[in-house]
Amino acid sequence: MSAYEERIVRTMEAFRRNRYDVSRFAECTAAADYLAAEIRGKRVGFGDSETLRALSLYERLRVHNEVIDPPRAGHGGIEAFLAAGREALMTDVFLLSANAITEEGQILNMDGAGNRVAGSLFGHEKTYFVVGINKLVPDIEAGIERIHHIAAPRNAHRKGKKTPCAK
């Protein structure tokens, strides 16, 4: 087994020790297929996530579910975004990504509006974190570095925010 493969296996085992169910997919399309098959007839809330957009999960899941995606509602202004964000907190299922995950089985998220973090913590029948290998870091310190130097600046640029990290 390669060092790369060992790192992934070690991370999956750490998440299992922390009582998370973990699935691994060789291709992004397989992950999207899995979620589309698993989630049917539900109200589904989304946290703001480029990962979910890249997998076309909104389009895939809305075929058999009612999907609430605050960024899509946000085109109607901040009030529409906030209303959809509150509604997403009351759904059966919640999907989001993470800014970073550690090899120790920890999830790191920094959230501007709070809707992603709030949605990940309470109330849903199921919560799915959809993360790519690009989010994997050795430890919390590396995760914080990833947030400060990769995730937050990209998010600020995408949203046109003039935050210190976006410079």
Predicted regions and their residues:
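N-terminal active-site beta-alpha-beta segment that forms phosphate/nucleotide-binding
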Residues: 4-95
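Conserved phosphate- and dinucleotide-binding cores of soluble alpha/beta proteins
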Residues: 89-167
